[in-house]
From Swiss-Prot:
MF terms in GO: 3-dehydroquinate dehydratase activity
Pathway in which the depicted protein is active: Metabolic intermediate biosynthesis; chorismate biosynthesis; chorismate from D-erythrose 4-phosphate and phosphoenolpyruvate: step 3/7
The protein, known as: 3-dehydroquinate dehydratase
Keywords tagged on the record: Amino-acid biosynthesis, Aromatic amino acid biosynthesis, Lyase, Schiff base
Annotated catalytic residues: 143, 170
Function: Involved in the third step of the chorismate pathway, which leads to the biosynthesis of aromatic amino acids. Catalyzes the cis-dehydration of 3-dehydroquinate (DHQ) and introduces the first double bond of the aromatic ring to yield 3-dehydroshikimate.
Amino acid sequence: MKTVTVKDLVIGAGAPKIIVSLMAKDIARVKSEALAYRETDFDILEWRVDHFADLSNVESVMAAAKILRETMPEKPLLFTFRSAKEGGEQAISTEAYIALNRAAIDSGLVDMIDLELFTGDDQVKETVAYAHAHDVKVVMSNHDFHKTPEAEEIIARLRKMQSFDADIPKIALMPQSTSDVLTLLAATLEMQEQYADRPIITMSMAKTGVISRLAGEVFGSAATFGAVKKASAPGQISVNDLRILLTILHQA
């Protein structure tokens, strides 16, 4: 399986990489939180742009991105607008969503974008090609905050992301039972062993799914999300505890 290298970070080799999400509402908070995050041990900074209030002002959005880039120049920056239908803070049109991601790509400030699988096949394919033409990697994602589908459906979604040339397919699902967590882990393992030719990220959410956030190296998930202050999804562990646990599992 090929790895994905962003800056000096090799995703898909060694222990799972730690992603933290910054969810500031304005430029002042972006700056203050970025300074606080700089003192934290993580691998990838995700900027959750759906939390940013001045979203209609592209210049303001890119000014905030510039602050993040200048504050943590060595960290890969993942630009993410999480749609309301997949658990995000704001609802915008598909056209606005694509335009926002294209603006981020054009800015030269971001290393990766998050692109939701169910945005629309044509729009997804075109945006992936556009990102790659500008040397920006694509994390293609799907989130279900209500349920966990069967393993076959999980694998089908991950394979579809791969067929759309995502650099890193990602899926996050809500378990209704412990069996759902096992379904997610089994699907991850099958995808990793039989179909994946690139790193994937999977997780089962909430307290029930915490084990999935730690066991990526065993089952085949290349990264996991940790909380610096407020968790961006249910079940996230503090970033400091997460690094300790991942290191223990990696060295065992």
